[in-house]
Amino acid sequence: EFKDLLDVLEGVAVKMLKIMEEECGDILSEFGIEKIAFGKIPRLTLREAQEIIFKEFGRDNRKEKDLTPQDEIDLCQWSKEKHKSDFVTITHFPTSAKPFYTMPDPKDPEYSLSYDLLFRGVEVMSGS
């Protein structure tokens, strides 16, 4: 199941960063790095994410096949404010924008079972 894959991948990212905070907390503090917000990671389809960008930030990218770097920054800001999470997972990018080996969603083949995991405005994991 795609959802199970996302559970594992999000879990790996969270665990990795929790260990980093535990083992390197003093160094992170020394450099003024803010503690990571580990709230429940919201999952949005690309279209849902673009709707949030439109409603919350006033940019209409709803016909685009991907997010802009500013979209990624803003979605992470939204996630932190609304969900107390520095992470957000974006799924279901258009099949036409992905490599041929990306699995189409059986429920809607126009979209793929692909994901980007964003952390503080940066795509840190991606796959299908």
Language model region names:
Residues L9-L117:
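Metal-assisted phosphate- and nucleotidyl-transfer catalytic regions
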Residues F2, K35-I36, S126:
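Residues at structural and domain junctions
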Residues G121-S128:
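Extended C-terminal subregions enriched in glycine
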Residues E1-D7:
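Catalytic palm subdomain of template-directed nucleic-acid polymerases
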